[in-house]
């Protein structure tokens, strides 16, 4: 949550025994601060489920050290509105691109799972 999160929503979660971390003052969570706070609590692994924007923001900030990407064989089109696994500004040159090391590919029914460890340039 951020400092702007509704107090009643935070209180409802805390009443259920959930620890709510404040990670920034703005409208969006400061992801670097969130990961730092989790590390301080000795939480070394998280399951990040979200859209391409969240995944892209985490990857762009180099906050991910392992990726598990699921692909369903459905082509829906839609241009920019179409959901993507990872969305962020990107790189000017191909040799700056993030690559994946120790790549593993699995198939679960019609879906494909790609697991790898990001290698960041520079």
Where does each model-flagged region fall?
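Enzymes that bind and transform nitrogen-containing heteroaromatic metabolites
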Residues: 1-122
